[in-house]
Amino acid sequence: ETQEAKARRTSLDYMVVGIPVGKVGIGFGLIPYSSVGYKIGRTAYVTNNNNDTIRSIISRYNGIGGVNKVFLGFGYRLTKNINIGGDLQYNFGTIETKSLQYQTDLQYGSRENNVSDLRGVNFDLGITYQTKVNSKYSFFSSLAYTPEAALNSGNTRNIEIVQLLSTSAVSVIERQNISVEDTKIKLPS
């Protein structure tokens, strides 16, 4: 018996475009800023004095999402040796985490779901200096400044009573939305 499988995958991790026009340069793009991706499972066994399993405690932790930034940059050549520039960035994304606890000797387990919707604006400024030291060597120096900025995080949370099915899927029995505050995440300068 033979089996045949085919798979195709296409992904675009980032896109950046730079356009030089004389003394001016313009750039724009979309770049991932951070990424969350994990799936952890653990089963602990509770035993009696005879080392017989009384129950299993199943724990699952999942996290997906991330933050991306779209930016527009501008650079200008002041002199033959000095360039200045800056860019404006808009950060956006969603991070979702889930935590499941289930004991096999109980009918139901619990799952906590958290979602953070992140948004924010920041900018960078920079200057570069470059000159020839001699015919073989060049000297290059740069200075960049990024002021402190913040990501606004709109947060939601719910707690669910769940039943673990024989297929390892989860059936939601009841859901309770929990009020959580929105937060600001500081991006240091």
Residue ranges and their predicted role:
Residues 1-189:
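Subset of outer-membrane beta-barrel
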